[in-house]
Amino acid sequence: MNPISHVAIIMDGNGRWGIKHKNSRNLGHKEGLITVEKIIDVAINNKIKFLTLFAFSTENWKRPKKEVEYLFSLLENFLIKKIKILDRKKIKLKLIGTINFNKKLNKLLKNSEKKTKFNNSIQVNLALNYGSRSEIINSVKKILKKKMEMNENNLSMNLYTKNIPDPEILIRTGNTHRLSNFLLWQLSYTEIFFEKKLWPDFNELDFRKIITRYKKLKRNFGAL
């Protein structure tokens, strides 16, 4: 049975869900946050120690300004209302990406990370303003600046995800089959599960089924 320490998720389909139900992309983003809470609980119950959520990519800035502003306000409200619950559940928040938003959101994110830094039930990595190509380029620049040897270990240790094991599982909802510039280095040997359901429809049972499927896989990492 394959152990699971790290699951990464591309939470795709919020906007399409909102259009389908109420002709509002924003509604889909709001419902998607409810799904996030449920999935975190399943991860904790299955003793998964790391969960990385692709929340906002560097490419998402191309979306309509009002939608981007709503996404930020939604995240602000979530942190204000839920930080005590996250702390009580011993959830550690870790930010990966370039945290360069408005002053209020920047402060909330940094304070939330600081407040939960000693929690140990699960580490939830929020990928915000994140792009994997930029992450890899920045890692190479750090190695050159530090005059370190250029090798796999040093490159890994200069990524946002240093000291975090590579994901065993990647889930992408929304019936789209691509990586979208997410954890390109870290996903080298990850098992990928593409789900037809839009993110707000993805539920606890769906997640548990993927966990079960993964545990039954024979993984050989290129060997026989």
Residue spans of the language-model regions?
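Flexible, compositionally biased loop and terminal segments
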Residues: 1-224
